[in-house]
UniProtKB/Swiss-Prot annotation:
Transmembrane segments: none
Taxonomic classification: Bacteria, Pseudomonadati, Pseudomonadota, Gammaproteobacteria, Vibrionales
Protein's organism: Photobacterium profundum (strain SS9)
UniProt-recorded name of the protein: Small ribosomal subunit protein uS19
Coiled coil region boundaries: none
The family this protein is said to belong to: Belongs to the universal ribosomal protein uS19 family.
Record's function text: Protein S19 forms a complex with S13 that binds strongly to the 16S ribosomal RNA.
Amino acid sequence: MPRSLKKGPFIDLHLLKKVEKAVESGDKKPVKTWSRRSMIIPQMIGLTIAVHNGRQHVPVFVSEEMIGHKLGEFAPTRTYRGHAADKKAKKR
């Protein structure tokens, strides 16, 4: 169920401060964050945000289409290596 419109988007305060600081200084370095639950807001457009996936920080370049989505959607946490191959088929 989506978040109520009257509540507005959720964004961690520490991330919001980092974003505002990066925007006013014009800094191009990635903003490092562990907050996967924060929503992408219009102020973040053009910034690169390094989102933690449990192992490393994945760089995410924010574009207009991403507004309203959460940061965690763009940093996958699981690596899919495929299903186990059939051993009988390999021997042939």
